[in-house]
Curated annotation (Swiss-Prot):
One annotated GO molecular function: RNA-DNA hybrid ribonuclease activity
GO biological process terms on file: DNA replication, removal of RNA primer; mismatch repair
CDD domains linked: RNase_HII_bacteria_HII_like
Gene Ontology terms: cellular component: cytoplasm; ribonuclease H2 complex
EC id: 3.1.26.4
Localisation: Cytoplasm
Source organism (scientific name): Escherichia coli O127:H6 (strain E2348/69 / EPEC)
Gene this chain is encoded by: rnhB
Binding site for a divalent metal cation: D16, E17, D108
Cofactor: how bound: Manganese or magnesium. Binds 1 divalent metal ion per monomer in the absence of substrate. May bind a second metal ion after substrate binding.
Keywords: Cytoplasm, Endonuclease, Hydrolase, Manganese, Metal-binding, Nuclease
Physiological role: Endonuclease that specifically degrades the RNA of RNA-DNA hybrids.
The reaction(s) this protein catalyses: Endonucleolytic cleavage to 5'-phosphomonoester
Protein name per UniProt: Ribonuclease HII
Domain of life: Bacteria
């Protein structure tokens, strides 16, 4: 992996999202400005960490970061805008929520939302840039907790296990029980379950 070269600036925020692929729930984003004086060991892409490690790092990030913020776009916004534009909106909300304005924003992936400060997309940033790794961890822990809470209300769908992704089990239960109000109606499998697909 090519080592990432930072822009020449002090306050850098990392931004990442979780939940573009699921059929249910919000897309959740996070923005994090780390404190160089308080380094956090073991930051890595949230998908490569155990749940226990993610939870521990999540608390450490919240405690040590100069600033952190969560953003989200709800299922109805995803349906109205499409998943890409809703994700960009959620990223804008996360950056706007930082109580310290960053001088530069690094975003995981290959495109940036419109922001009031310079920004750059970093492919595989969640494993190359600690600020993005930290954002990835916060977003994933937050969204996983939301799916666990939804699982208590709708136990028949198994949200705590598959986190809303279109697994065979989820698709089977969607066909059997129909969609909840938290499902994304613009997504093909949900449309089909509701009889809306042409």
């Amino acid at each position: 992996m090519i080592e990432f070269v930072y822009p020449h600036t002090q306050l850098v925020a990392g931004v990442d999202e979780v939940g573009r692929g699921p059929l249910v729930g919000a897309v959740v984003t996070a923005a994090v400005i780390l404190d160089p004086a308080r380094p956090i060991a073991g930051l890595n892409d949230s998908k490569k960490l155990s749940e226990k490690r993610r939870l521990a790092l999540c608390e450490e990030i919240k405690e040590k970061a100069l600033s952190w913020s969560l953003g989200r776009a709800e299922p109805h916004e995803i349906d109205e805008l499409n998943i890409l534009h809703a994700t960009m909106l959620a990223m804008q909300r996360a950056v706007a929520g930082l109580h310290i304005a960053p001088e530069y924003v690094l975003i995981d992936g290959n495109r940036c939302p419109k922001l009031p400060m310079p920004s750059m997309a970093v492919v595989k940033g969640d494993s190359r840039v600690p600020e993005i790794s930290a954002a990835s961890i916060l977003a994933k822990v937050t969204r996983d907790a939301e799916m666990a809470a939804l699982d208590i209300v709708f136990p028949q769908y198994g949200f705590a296990q598959h986190k809303g992704y279109p697994t065979a089990f989820h698709l089977e239960k969607l066909a059997e029980h129909g969609a909840t109000e938290h499902h994304r109606r613009s997504f093909g499998p949900v449309k089909r379950a509701l009889g809306l697909a042409s």
